[in-house]
Amino acid sequence: MLLLAIESSCDETAAAVVRDGRIILSNIVASQISVHAGYGGVVPEIASRKHLETISTVIEEALQAAGVSLTDVDGIAVTQGPGLAGALLVGISTAKAMAYALGVPIAGVNHIESHILAIFLERSIEFPFVALAVSGGHTHLYLVEAVGRYKTLGQTLDDAAGEAFDKVAKLLGLPYPGGALIDRLAAEGDPEAIRFPRPLMRDESFNFSFSGLKTSVLNYLQKNPAAADGRALNDLCASFQAAVCDVLVSKTAAAVSATGIKRVVVAGGVACNNGLRREMSRLAELKGIELHIPSPLLCSDNAAMIAVPGDYYLSNNILSGFDIDALPVWPLDSIASRLTKGS
């Protein structure tokens, strides 16, 4: 099956052409970072307008790069949620119009599900597995039993890990988005220079909390204003990143121990972080865990990942009707009830 996949949940306008949910023929991403940088974060209304301006061009580029035409497309997969309502609607409206015009089926898929399943674009792995989905808007641990079958093990009680990175970067005067900059600065710093707290690390649940860690960084900066410059900045970034990674790795290890499943997927934008990738690899080696982390391009928002669950649902006649609407909030473990066979 040849799928056109569309992603517009936040500030990337993306389209991809993927065969059989595994073979990427093209994967085009138009970023809005430069547009939102001056505001220090994503402005939803501006994001929606930029999606409207860009989406047709991005789709055309994806088709050209794949060497196919619209009439070759067998179905369309589109991000239905979670995400920004206006941004989602741009992608969904475009997908519905194209599917109707072409007479092909459409599948609305979950953005977080797509992050978790993106690994299948690079290799096949067996179910079940434990998944850590970690991004700017989500930090969750899931038990993944099969495509469409997910159980939430734990989640953030406040800030997501990626959100904490961006907020701390802002405290340090770093430009948006700051997570990648903290990662680069941390590489030259001492992760043991400052002992920041590890929230909920000894808690028996699999939940996360990062707002207190962010506040600890703020308090440290107020007492040590020089820490935002030079070598001290590298040490602060390394120490903050180490605290976040320690919590993520510890909770993942606990989930592996509790479920008895020694197969782990780490997915989402924060999975690009070099410190997290390194510490997860150490955990895997120490505990004999089969670890899977997609390449950075497939960790960040893209449309190729949307095609993975999209292909599964369309191939199994689990379709979305033309009344498909945006789901800004869409818990992953409720996904089965959102999909109707043969509709």
From Swiss-Prot:
<keyword id="KW-0479">Metal-binding</keyword>
<dbReference type="InterPro" id="IPR017861">
    <property type="entry name" value="KAE1/TsaD"/>
</dbReference>
<dbReference type="Pfam" id="PF00814">
    <property type="entry name" value="TsaD"/>
</dbReference>
<comment type="similarity">
    <text>Belongs to the KAE1 / TsaD family.</text>
</comment>
<protein>
    <recommendedName>
        <fullName>tRNA N6-adenosine threonylcarbamoyltransferase</fullName>
        <ecNumber>2.3.1.234</ecNumber>
    </recommendedName>
</protein>
<dbReference type="InterPro" id="IPR043129">
    <property type="entry name" value="ATPase_NBD"/>
</dbReference>
<keyword id="KW-0819">tRNA processing</keyword>
<feature type="binding site">
    <location>
        <position position="301"/>
    </location>
    <ligand>
        <name>Fe cation</name>
    </ligand>
</feature>
<feature type="binding site">
    <location>
        <position position="273"/>
    </location>
    <ligand>
        <name>substrate</name>
    </ligand>
</feature>
<feature type="binding site">
    <location>
        <position position="111"/>
    </location>
    <ligand>
        <name>Fe cation</name>
    </ligand>
</feature>
<feature type="binding site">
    <location>
        <position position="179"/>
    </location>
    <ligand>
        <name>substrate</name>
    </ligand>
</feature>
<keyword id="KW-0963">Cytoplasm</keyword>
<dbReference type="GO" id="GO:0061711">
    <property type="term" value="F:N(6)-L-threonylcarbamoyladenine synthase activity"/>
</dbReference>
<dbReference type="GO" id="GO:0005737">
    <property type="term" value="C:cytoplasm"/>
</dbReference>
<keyword id="KW-0012">Acyltransferase</keyword>
<feature type="binding site">
    <location>
        <begin position="133"/>
        <end position="137"/>
    </location>
    <ligand>
        <name>substrate</name>
    </ligand>
</feature>
<comment type="function">
    <text>Required for the formation of a threonylcarbamoyl group on adenosine at position 37 (t(6)A37) in tRNAs that read codons beginning with adenine. Is involved in the transfer of the threonylcarbamoyl moiety of threonylcarbamoyl-AMP (TC-AMP) to the N6 group of A37, together with TsaE and TsaB. TsaD likely plays a direct catalytic role in this reaction.</text>
</comment>
<keyword id="KW-0408">Iron</keyword>
<dbReference type="GO" id="GO:0005506">
    <property type="term" value="F:iron ion binding"/>
</dbReference>
<keyword id="KW-0808">Transferase</keyword>
<dbReference type="InterPro" id="IPR022450">
    <property type="entry name" value="TsaD"/>
</dbReference>
<dbReference type="InterPro" id="IPR000905">
    <property type="entry name" value="Gcp-like_dom"/>
</dbReference>
<feature type="binding site">
    <location>
        <position position="183"/>
    </location>
    <ligand>
        <name>substrate</name>
    </ligand>
</feature>
<feature type="binding site">
    <location>
        <position position="166"/>
    </location>
    <ligand>
        <name>substrate</name>
    </ligand>
</feature>
<dbReference type="GO" id="GO:0002949">
    <property type="term" value="P:tRNA threonylcarbamoyladenosine modification"/>
</dbReference>
<feature type="binding site">
    <location>
        <position position="115"/>
    </location>
    <ligand>
        <name>Fe cation</name>
    </ligand>
</feature>
